C-alpha cells in the first residue's frame, strides 16, 4: 500500500502541475494573439471563444462578452478602454468573439446570439436586429444585465479619435466599471441605465 502511494502521489502532483501550467500557457496565448490584433499589451484579460461558446455564456454563464473584429477602427479604439477598465476593476477574463465571419454567413450560432440579445441590438435598414460592433454584453447567471454598443452604428462622418474625447472616455469607463463590478459580484443591476 505504501509503495503504491509513493508512486500515485508524485504522479497526481505532476498531473496537477501540468494542468495548471497548461492553463496559464493557453490563456497567455490568447492574450498574445489579442495583443497582435488590437495592440493592447500582452497583459490583457481577453480569451477567445467561438460563437457556440458565446451562446452558452449568454444562456448559462456569468462574464463580460466582447464582440468585434480587428479590422474595425471603432473596435480598436473601444477595446483599449474596455481593457484598461477591466484591469482596474480586477476582471480576469473577457470573452472575445470575432463575430465578422458568423455575421456575414448568418450562421445558426449568430442567429441564436441575435435571439438571445433581442431588444438590446440596433436594427438594419430592413428592420432586422443585428449585432453591430463594437458590442459588449454583461452577463450574470445567463441573464444579460446590460450592454454597451454606443459606437456600433455611428452614421456621421467622424473618426474614433474625434468621437472619444476625454469626457466621452471618462463617461464610458465609469459605465463599464460599474457593470464589470456587478459581473464580478454576480449581481443584477435594475437601474444601470438611469
PLM regions: where:
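Thiol-based oxidoreductase modules, predominantly thioredoxin-like and allied folds used
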Residues: 40-49, 67, 91-116
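A short beta-strand-turn-helix
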Residues: 45-62
Amino acid at each position: 500500500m505504501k509503495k503504491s502511494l509513493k508512486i500515485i502521489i508524485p504522479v497526481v502532483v505532476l498531473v496537477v502541475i501540468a494542468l495548471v501550467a497548461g492553463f496559464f500557457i493557453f490563456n497567455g496565448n490568447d492574450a498574445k494573439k489579442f495583443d497582435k490584433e488590437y495592440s493592447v499589451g500582452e497583459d490583457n484579460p481577453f480569451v477567445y471563444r467561438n460563437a457556440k461558446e458565446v451562446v452558452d455564456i449568454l444562456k448559462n454563464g456569468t462574464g463580460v462578452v466582447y464582440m468585434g473584429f480587428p479590422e474595425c477602427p471603432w473596435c480598436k479604439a473601444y477595446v483599449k478602454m474596455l481593457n484598461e477598465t477591466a484591469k482596474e476593476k480586477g476582471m480576469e477574463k473577457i470573452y472575445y468573439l470575432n463575430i465578422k465571419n458568423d455575421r456575414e454567413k448568418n450562421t445558426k450560432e449568430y442567429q441564436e446570439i441575435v435571439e438571445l440579445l433581442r431588444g438590446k441590438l440596433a436594427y438594419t435598414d430592413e428592420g432586422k436586429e443585428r449585432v453591430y460592433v463594437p458590442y459588449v454584453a454583461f452577463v450574470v447567471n445567463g441573464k444579460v444585465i446590460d450592454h454597451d454598443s454606443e459606437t456600433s452604428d455611428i452614421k456621421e462622418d467622424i473618426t474614433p479619435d474625434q468621437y472619444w474625447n476625454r469626457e466621452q472616455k471618462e463617461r464610458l469607463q465609469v459605465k463599464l466599471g460599474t457593470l464589470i463590478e456587478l459581473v464580478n459580484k454576480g449581481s443584477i443591476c435594475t437601474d444601470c441605465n438611469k
